[in-house]
Regions:
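C-terminal accessory module of base-excision DNA glycosylases/AP lyases that mediates lesion recognition
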Residues: 4-116
Length: 116
């Protein structure tokens, strides 16, 4: 998947028709979607329409993000997939659910995702 993502920035895939509408939901993205949907965090059925859920978030983000601050023409489904993975990591830290690969220091002065 990472190879395909990298090839997207070459002549081979720069004109791919599904750049904005497809991304592979990895384990972190699936857990992030599960958190948002209130599903069991371990739910990971491959036949589930993960891409449809990510596309819905992509559409919502395009409606709500300020185009004067973010170049939305470069905002792809890959950003949604990566954002969901990061959301899951930060949620695990906040909820003290196991360990993460990297160490993050919590700062109570920074806003939580719920406050943004």
């Amino acid at each position: 998947y990472e190879v395909i993502t990298d090839l997207r920035h070459t002549y081979l895939l720069r004109d791919a028709k599904d750049i904005l509408t497809w991304a592979n939901a990895g384990p972190g993205a699936m857990r992030g979607l599960n958190r948002l949907a209130g599903r069991d965090l371990d739910f990971s059925r491959r036949s589930h329409p993960w891409n449809d859920e990510m596309r819905e978030l992509w559409e919502i983000s395009r409606e709500r993000l300020n185009p004067n601050l973010i170049d939305l023409s470069r905002f792809e489904m890959r950003e949604i997939e990566g954002g969901l993975c990061e959301f899951d990591k930060y949620s695990r830290i906040l909820n003290e659910e196991g360990r993460t690969r990297s160490v993050y220091k919590y700062d109570e002065n920074l806003p939580l995702i719920e406050d943004i």
